[in-house]
Structures are given as C-alpha cells and as structure tokens.
Amino acid sequence: MSLDRLIEKIEKTQNPSVAGLDPKLAYVPEYIKEKCFEKYGETLKGAAKALLEFNKGLIDALYDIVPAVKPQAAYYEMYGPAGVKALYKTQEYARSKGMYVITDGKRNDIGTTMEAYAAAHLGKVQVGSQTYEPFLGDALTVNGYQIGRAHV
C-alpha cells in the first residue's frame, strides 16, 4: 500500500518531513536559467527545463535525508504542456531516487498558488523577455474554501 511505503521511508530516514517543490522561475539560480534559455530560448519549454534542472538538484541533495517531495502542480502548469511534462519528469526523478511523491494539486489553495493557477489557465506568463499564454481557457472552475471539521 502507498502509505506503507511512506512509513518505511520515514523510518529509514528518521525524518517525517516533506520537501515542497513550488518552483517559481524567480527562485531558479541564474546559471540554470541561462543554460536552459540558451538551449531552448526564452520559451515555456526553456522555463520548464529550468524548473526540472532545479528540482533535480534539490532532489539530489535531499533524497537520503527527506522521505518525500510534494510538487505543487500550479507552478508547473504555469508553463503549459512543457510545464506539465516537467512535473511528470520531477515526479519520475524523485521516484528513481526512492522518494515518496505527493502531488499537491488542490485548486482552492492560498493566494500565491491561486495566482499561479490563474496565470496558467487564464493569464499570461513571463519567461525572460517573452510573454506566453500557457493554456487557452476562457474560464476556470475552482472549489471555494471549505471550512470546518467536516472538510479536514
């Protein structure tokens, strides 16, 4: 069972932490962005490749001391299909290192995450000096915050 694997990882690392992977392009070191933009241009693909490279470095540094990662889907969806592929590749890489992967895909999240979903599905995203419209929806359905014990 899935949770049994997580418990095993927690026991092995003696650490109940989860590393959140909420990679805003602004957080990615310049040398990674420059390398990816040189190869793929200031494109959604270039941005997504930069996120993936950054994540790989984090995973390499953490996999033997932290049992799990939690990539936030919104920050990948901001870069369209290339970003969704980077999410998949991040998950695949974390699993290859033996980590437990929790996809954070809640659509009724905090402000910064909602801004990322809005940019991905309704707005525009800046990559270097270029601006892109990752997905072409005219509207996006979301769940409102649900408060109370029944919703925890």
How would you name each of these model-derived features?
Residues 13-17, 64-67, 97-99, 135-138:
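Short, well-ordered coil/turn segments that N-cap beta-strands
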Residues 47, 71-83:
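Glycine-rich, proline-tolerant flexible connector loops at the mouths of alpha/beta enzymes
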Residues 83-103:
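Alpha-helix-loop-beta-strand connector modules within alpha/beta enzyme cores
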Residues 47-62, 113-130:
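Short, acidic/polar
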Residues 1-61:
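N-terminal glycine-rich anion-binding loop in soluble enzyme alpha/beta folds
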